[in-house]
Amino acid sequence: MLILTRKVGESVLIGDDISITVLSVRGNQVKLGVEAPKEVSVHREEIYQRIKQTKDEPYLASS
């Protein structure tokens, strides 16, 4: 795991197409801005887990 320290307004680049910028810090909450191509899905972890769980659940057959 790469660990970085950033200040408000500073960014981290992932590859050539993805930029994550620190927008604000208030207490223990950090607001991030993510710029990525439309074909790259960007989700909060808890939302991604729900999406993954929904895809993994078998569909119930109606009788």
Swiss-Prot record:
Its main location: cytoplasm. Keywords: Activator, Cytoplasm, Repressor, RNA-binding, Translation regulation. One of its GO terms (biological process) is regulation of carbohydrate metabolic process. It is found in: Cytoplasm. One of its GO terms (molecular function) is mRNA 5'-UTR binding. A key translational regulator that binds mRNA to regulate translation initiation and/or mRNA stability. Mediates global changes in gene expression, shifting from rapid growth to stress survival by linking envelope stress, the stringent response and the catabolite repression systems. Usually binds in the 5'-UTR; binding at or near the Shine-Dalgarno sequence prevents ribosome-binding, repressing translation, binding elsewhere in the 5'-UTR can activate translation and/or stabilize the mRNA. Its function is antagonized by small RNA(s). HAMAP family: CsrA. This is Translational regulator CsrA. It comes from Haemophilus influenzae (strain PittEE).
